[in-house]
A protein has these predicted regions:
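Acidic, metal-coordinating helix/loop segments flanking the phosphotransfer/catalytic sites
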Residues: 34-52
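Two-component/phosphorelay signaling modules centered on CheY-like receiver
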Residues: 15-33
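Acidic catalytic/metal-coordinating carboxylates
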Residues: 36-37, 63-67
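Receiver (REC) domain active-site loop signature in two-component systems and cognate sites
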Residues: 59
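Alpha4 helix (beta4-alpha4-beta5 surface) of REC/receiver domains from two-component response regulators
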Residues: 66, 87-109, 116, 120
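Active-site residues of response regulator receiver
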Residues: 12, 56, 84
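Non-catalytic signal-transmission and effector/linker regions of two-component phosphorelay proteins
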Residues: 1-7, 114-127
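Short amphipathic alpha-helix used as the core "switch/output" element in two-component signaling
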Residues: 43, 65-78, 97
Length: 127
């Protein structure tokens, strides 16, 4: 598959989920950095390096909403695709976090996600 010259950061504490997302996207030419620990991902994050971040919402140490806030403070232009087994509103209520509207640079997909859903969402966000 041809390289699409887009770099994506994936943070999901479920190793198998992160690995699967990485393999799917790499097969379509994306350059992927994947982490299971949100603290390590935050330490390694560099502004203006990523075209998209894919963040699980339910993670230990730092949930996806908190991680998003910290990444966004370092790179205001970052686009984020939240992914969770919970609905977006349930995840928000569970973590008592700031509710981010799902629009433009912020989108949400509920697990389990199909390859087609994932690719459609990713391509629409990295244009």
């Amino acid at each position: 598959m041809a390289q699409v010259n887009k770099r994506i950061l994936i943070v999901d504490d479920e190793k198998d989920v992160g690995r699967t997302l990485k393999l799917i996207l790499e097969n379509y030419g994306f350059d992927i950095d994947s982490f299971t620990d949100p603290v390590v991902a935050l330490e390694k994050f560099k502004p203006n390096l990523y075209d998209l971040t894919i963040l699980d919402i339910r993670m230990p140490k730092i949930n996806g909403f908190e991680l998003y806030q910290q990444l966004k403070s370092r790179d205001p232009k970052i686009k984020t695709l939240f992914i969770s087994a919970l609905s977006y509103l349930t995840a928000y209520k569970t973590h008592n976090s700031k509710l981010y509207p799902i629009e433009g640079e912020r989108q949400f997909i509920k697990k389990p996600v199909t390859n087609k859903e994932l690719l459609e969402q990713v391509y629409s966000m990295v244009r």
